[in-house]
């Protein structure tokens, strides 16, 4: 389930391919939008679209690119240390659904955040496909702890595609937890260390 928002900096929820909820308790330092909202709000967001990952990586990234899929956009402003985690939830509600999301995370210089992502299906939607493209950008001396917690159906096919670029002195921790058997899972996250002291675990 979704944890009480009193213990979270913010929450964003997608059901199938549409955003159903977005809230933010730390607006002074954390920005939470849908990817499409961010693209419309800021001209510079286009510089982060398909920069960490090529849309030609495979057929799943290509489909995400061609459909201009929505997803979540999380930005932590320069020097800001978030007091609580941001939680995201991706739920597949309808059976035989293709959930296709494109997420962007930007950690500005010296910022810090923990993100907890929960992904699941309803009991009636197990025979579905989840594609989640996540591009993560850590500027110098930033810190991100990113945890995916998945609970899929036994017939669900899951194709997370994650790429991170990590600047000088920045630290990125990536955890993946699968709570129960899944039909098919294919994942190959890639991190690029782009400066002295950059680290990924």
Which ranges hold each PLM region?
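Short, Gly/Pro- and small/polar-rich lid/capping loops
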Residues: 1-18
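Conserved beta-strand/loop scaffold segments within soluble protein domains that form the structured core
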Residues: 15, 22-33, 40-201
